[in-house]
Amino acid sequence: MGKDTIADLLTSIRNADMNKKGTVRVVSTNITENIVKILLREGFIESVRKHQESNRYFLVLTLRHQRRKTRKGIYRTRTFLKRISRPGLRIYANYQGIPKVLGGMGIAILSTSRGIMTDREARLNRIGGEVLCYIW
């Protein structure tokens, strides 16, 4: 039985966000590095650094916490992450069938023949692929 490193990455970020942690440490693989680069570029995390411990590499992510003020006080905005395609049920979409997350407000991350990219990049390049996760 294999490990789902993408689900581990998303769960670690989600748990750290719910517990108001500033940093998260996740195992570094090629897929997780590409997903973290997309999250950094889209502004969901602040910074990334690679850390080595006894022959294993880890990514240390600094989360972005936004605060907004309402009548009842200050509250934190949350980052929602949802795994779509999983090892037991793969979900594929052609470029015309790539879903828009929250009407274009969120992003979908796809694994295509040209690498891991967002839904907007895949539509511009007119290529489809496996829908890995939604982020909004």
Curated annotation (Swiss-Prot):
It is found in: Plastid, Chloroplast. It comes from the Eukaryota. This is Small ribosomal subunit protein uS8c. One of the primary rRNA binding proteins, it binds directly to 16S rRNA central domain where it helps coordinate assembly of the platform of the 30S subunit. The keyword Acetylation does not apply. Pfam families: Ribosomal_S8. Disulfide bonds: none annotated. GO terms for cellular component: chloroplast; ribonucleoprotein complex; ribosome. Part of the 30S ribosomal subunit. PANTHER family: 40S RIBOSOMAL PROTEIN S15A (PTHR11758). Keywords: Chloroplast, Plastid, Ribonucleoprotein, Ribosomal protein, RNA-binding, rRNA-binding. Belongs to the universal ribosomal protein uS8 family. InterPro entries: Ribosomal_uS8, Ribosomal_uS8_CS, Ribosomal_uS8_sf. GO terms for molecular function: rRNA binding; structural constituent of ribosome. GO terms for biological process: translation. HAMAP family: Ribosomal_uS8_B. The lineage of its organism: Eukaryota, Viridiplantae, Streptophyta, Embryophyta, Tracheophyta. NCBIfam families: PRK00136.1.
